[in-house]
C-alpha cells in the first residue's frame, strides 16, 4: 500500500499536465542565457558631444619689447646728417585690438575624452605700428653739417597692416565633466600680414614708402575654464599668451623734406628696419554649445 501511494505522488504532476495543457511543464534544466539579450540589457555609454563652438569677443594686448630702429642704405645728402645703424633711444610698439571671435573645437576619442583640438576664427586684426622714444620725439635729421634742416619729428604713427594669425592648440580638460571644467592648452600660431602700408604724414609727404612685414611664428600657452549653463550650453573665459613671436618690419625708400635747406629740398633717408617682440596676451569671453 505504501508503495502504491509513493508511485501516485510521483505520477501526479505528469497526470495534471496531461489534463491541463496550459499548466506549466515540469521543471527542467534552464538553457544558458542568450548573450545577445545580455548585451542588449547592458546600458549604453553616454553620448559624447565631440564638436563645440563658442561665440564671443577677443581682446589682443601685445606685451611688446622693441629693439632700436635701424637705418640702412643711406646715401647722398642724407649721409651728411645720418649714418647706417641703430637710432639711439628709438623703438616701436604695436597697438591693441578687439575683435568678434569664434572658438571651434573637436574632442578626440582618447584619454577619456580629455583632449581636444581647437582654433580661433575671426576677422583680420588691424596691426598698427607706432614709433616710440627718439624716433617719435626727435627729427630723423635735425642738422646737416651743423645747418638746421627743418625736418620734423615723425610722431607716434608709423604704419599699419591686416593680420590673419592662424592658430591651433591642443587643449587638456582637467575636469572633463561637471558644471565647471578648467583646462590648459599648448599650440602654435604664425602672424601673416597683408596690405601693409606706411601711414606717417611726415614719411609720406614726399613719396609713399613701402612697408613689408615678415611672417612671425609663436608658441601658444593657454588656460581657462568653462561653466555649464544648461545641458549643452557653456560660458567660457580663456587666456592665451603667445611667446617668442618677433615681428620684423621694413620701410623702404624713405624720403623727407628739408625745408630749411632749399638746395636739396628732399633727401633720401633709405631704409628703416624695425624688430618687435610682440608676445601678445589674448583674452576671450564666449558662450556656445556642444554638438
Regions found by a protein language model. Give the residues of each.
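Extracellular/periplasm-exposed beta-strand and loop segments of Gram-negative cell-envelope proteins
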Residues: 63-97, 124-164, 190-216, 244-282
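Repeated loop/turn-to-beta-strand initiation elements of outer-membrane beta-barrel proteins
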Residues: 111-117, 178-180, 233-235
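Residues on the lipid-exposed face of transmembrane beta-strands in outer-membrane beta-barrel proteins
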Residues: 55-57, 102-106, 121, 166-172, ...
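Hydrophobic, well-structured mid-protein blocks that either form specific transmembrane helices
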Residues: 157-189, 193
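Hydrophobic alpha-helix-in-membranes signature
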Residues: 12, 61, 99, 108, ...
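Short glycine/proline- and aromatic-enriched beta-strand/turn motifs that initiate or cap beta-hairpins
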Residues: 19-106, 282-284, 288-290
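Gram-negative bacterial Sec-dependent N-terminal signal peptides
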Residues: 1-17
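Outer-membrane beta-barrel proteins
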Residues: 14, 37-44, 61, 105-110, ...
